[in-house]
Amino acid sequence: MNLVGGYQHHHHHHHHHHMLHEPFLFGPAARCHQERAYFPGWVLNPAEVTPELHGQSPAYGPAEFGSGGAGRLEALSGRLGRRKGVGGPKKERRRTESINSAFAELRECIPNVPADTKLSKIKTLRLATSYIAYLMEVLARDSQPGEPEGFKAELKKADGRENKRKRETQPEVYSQPLAHGEKKLKGRTGWPQQVWALELNP
């Protein structure tokens, strides 16, 4: 009886001990797991976290954050680790120089831009897009038989005005007759200055 009673007492004590500490043992763990579920998304926000991770050691990686999103975190820490290596800054500098060189070549392809005008990358891309659209329009009109040579130069001028209205309204303005504009703008050639002037002064 005493042994059974002792066993029952021990079992009761163990059960009480388990119930007493269960909220303490599992409560924070569950809460930590919930935080980890949101943590990988926070890590992948470059505006907030990338500068901090960039200053930390490579060991500050997925092991700190739990298993949630470990693959994405490893990829992120791997990129940061390569940047901190010996070849990282040089590779990044070469990539930047390559991009700048490509933009410089693209600027040279855009006509009627003053030599002293400095174009940002976004303005260069916008001008290039407008110029490509303009060239495609010229090619489309050149494919129509019976157009006189002088009318092509006028198309470029009138097309510049239509480009402005196209961005503000709808593309159908290209179908409007251009004979009226030919008399006013006859003799002017080249890509219309209105197009790049509009982009230079947004």
Curated annotation (Swiss-Prot):
Tell me which UniProt keywords the record has, alphabetically: Developmental protein, DNA-binding, Nucleus, Transcription, Transcription regulation
**Is Transcription among the key words of this record?**
yes
**Primary localization:** nucleus
Q: What is this protein called?
A: Heart- and neural crest derivatives-expressed protein 1
Gene Ontology cellular-component terms listed: cytoplasm; nucleolus; nucleoplasm; RNA polymerase II transcription regulator complex
Q: Where is the composition biased (Basic and acidic residues)?
A: 149-162
Please report the organism this UniProt entry assigns to the protein.
Gallus gallus
Q: Which Pfam families match?
A: HLH
What is the purpose of this protein?
Transcription factor. Plays an essential role in cardiac morphogenesis.
Recorded superkingdom? Eukaryota
The molecular function terms in GO held by this entry are: bHLH transcription factor binding; DNA-binding transcription activator activity, RNA polymerase II-specific; DNA-binding transcription factor activity, RNA polymerase II-specific; DNA-binding transcription repressor activity, RNA polymerase II-specific; enzyme binding; protein homodimerization activity; RNA polymerase II cis-regulatory region sequence-specific DNA binding; RNA polymerase II transcription regulatory region sequence-specific DNA binding
InterPro entries on file: bHLH_dom, E-box_TF_Regulators, HLH_DNA-bd_sf
